Amino acid sequence: MEKTESFCPEVPPQDCGASPRPSLRSLPKNQGSLLQFDRQAPGRISTSPTLRRLRTRGCGTRQDAWQVTTWGSWGAPVGFPCYLSKSLPGSPKDSSHLLSPLRLHSRLTSEPERALNAADSLEPQTRPTDKYLPPELQPVNEGSLHQASLRQQEGHFLPSPTLRHPSPQGEELHPSRFYEHRRSSVVLNLPGLEVFPGDLLVSDGAADYLCHPLLLLNSESKKPRWPFSKRGVGKDKHKHISDLENCLSSVKITSFRGYDFYGLKDKTWDEVLETHHKLPTDQLDLKKQQEAVWELFTSECTYFLDHLLVLKMIFMNTLRYLQTHEYLLDVDLWRLFANLEELTQTSLGFVNSLFGIIKDYVDASEISSSLDFISVLTKYFRGSLCQSHQTYCLNYSAAIFYLESLRQRDDFGIYLKWCEQNEQCRRLHVPELLVAPLQRLTRYPLLLKNIWKRSMDSAEKIMIYSIKEKVEKSIRDLEGKVKWLDNFQKFRYLQEIIVWPPLWDRDKRFFIPECLKHIFKEHMAENILSPTSRHLLYEGKLTLAESTRFLDVYLFLFNDFLLVTKTKCNKKKLGGSDPGLMCPSLTPELQAVIKEGGSCTVLDQPIPLDRLVVKSIEPLHVSVFGLRNAFLIQHENRYRQCIAAFLLQAQTENIKKTWMAQITTAISCFTKSQETKKISLFTLPAESSEI
């Protein structure tokens, strides 16, 4: 085969190691198979960072020109490396660095004739299949390539999905055409083809990348670093906050001055009589009784206007208004305000009734008329006044805990700030307003007692005293209900977080076949924490010393047994857990466990208090193990044999002493209660004489 040498004009190097650009020669027709994609072609381009670094190190030296026998009529100076004249758009600058000249020399000069013969042998297999290729891969004729080259000279690069062949008229083209092409054969321009790190591409010029946007390394084609990108969340959140503030600015709060008794809450009884030209009574005791009733009335006015009405009109109604405009929809009004609506109506009726009897007394022309307040007190204190306060107070602790969980939200914080800035709040915050019904209920007996002391009529005193006793009994019942409710809620949450492992998991000594495990599952101990007769006396976090490690444990001391558990926090937090639903009486450690979706796994069977022995450990005995503030708990069976032992370590000496004192007191109380039960069982009624 004839070998030709190509002539290339001298071009000053533009990059490190750049060599003169060769001209295009006509390609023989029998070499069409060489236009197929070849990953091993010398002109391949790699975007691999490692290969780019190798090229960067080798581009500092210039190699002398050397002659290479090319395929067909292709020719290039010796040592000519194939590269792109322009960098890929969006790619690093070093992506067009030179290949190693030694590698090119060894690959191009090894056996050129064998490569040519192999190409000729592949021609009959590749030619007939051109008609079955898709339109993107079918070859084009020379005329279309010539027209494309002319358009390229004019500066218009049109994308083409077809394969690019060297034009046989390449010698007659403008020299800029030579600078745009390389002796590497072809670029596969496939629809949807993207360039990724490590891909090998064969290109005939940098212009191909400019005219084919499918091969651009655009940022849109790459996947983001995080699949669920939070891009734009800040803008949406800012817009939501701005819309919430605009909605709050449209809220209108009505004035409280429309009530008839609004101007009387800050006046004294003498000022009221003087305003209405009413002469005070000559009886000193009757006047003191009237002043006591007036104190009940004015305090109820202040309670209604400055607390209940503020909570209802400013806080609760504003929240309802926001929820109608689709803000704070997940905030539960009942959990936050309970029966505030009922409480407000009851207090308003009580104030209006007292205001009515006072107005009748002041407007009366008779001097000897008296205040008829007994009927009003009987109606409300024996009616719905105490009952409505009880309902509210039972929900108070949960409401405060729910409020603290809502304070962490930005939108709810903006709502609270807007409400508390209202002038009718009188610089009172939400917790101070929510606690007002509890304080009011405990003050009622004091106000009634003051009226009872000032009364002279015996029948009247008996009625007032009975009303006072009724209110005090209601408060005692409320305290019992609060304790019972708190204990019930606490045990309910303990049942959820305390895990009772089966026998075969708790102790590996016992072997239970799968066919028999259903027998033991029927007698699991989930219901052992029944709140009816069992109370939690003390709880806390300690450290259990084992043979090879220290284990964080959590102890529950009940009135009849001790439970040792180990806390296990879930690394994947449960998204559905609502912190507002937790019992407020739980310790911070248990609340943290619940928030993280963790649990408390029982280490051993419950230790009855009559089988429990607690002993203090001197530091001298355990100093070699690095233990401090340690004490020992022994579990004995009915034969006084030790069947389990727990070496526990407290954080401080005071915590250790507190634990030992609590356990000792619980053991003593449990032993006395057991002895009392035995005595009652052995005490039999007297025998009848008729038997």
Curated annotation (Swiss-Prot):
> Its GO biological process terms?
Rho protein signal transduction
> Residues annotated as region Disordered?
1-48, 109-140
Alphabetically sorted, this entry's keywords are: Glycoprotein
Q: Which residues form the DH domain?
A: 313-488
Instruction: Give a yes or no for keyword Cell wall biogenesis/degradation in this entry.
Output: no
Q: Please indicate which superkingdom the organism of origin belongs to.
A: Eukaryota
| List of glycosylated residues | 395
All copies of domain PH, residue ranges: 535-668
| Gene Ontology MF annotations | guanyl-nucleotide exchange factor activity
What is the protein name for this chain? Pleckstrin homology domain-containing family G member 7
Q: Organism source for this protein?
A: Homo sapiens
Q: What is the gene name?
A: PLEKHG7
